[in-house]
Amino acid sequence: MSLIYHTHVYFLPQQAGFAAALHATLAAQLPAGCWLGQLIHREVGPHTRPMFEIDFAASLLPAVETLLQQHRGPLPVLLHPQQADELAAHTSAARWLGEALPLKLDTLGG
């Protein structure tokens, strides 16, 4: 099985319109094989802002990252691999595009 990546695109309530426009752009431009989640207008799990998620095979990472860099504007993005150690996935194995946000790491175990 190939490595799967999760990408979380965060937004503040006042950025919801921009986030929805970005979501629509990504829906039209993401490569085949990507899963694009709906906008979640509240904090969920370890995430400290509203967000939406994109899941994809590691082979698509360059294409997805390029699209996000081109279109994300001021929105922070967390990219991380799916792995058994959720804490490591969201910290040492993760990287940020834009501002690095705090996460509720205690919800991830270790």
Say what each PLM segment does.
Residues 1-110:
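Long, contiguous binding/interaction regions
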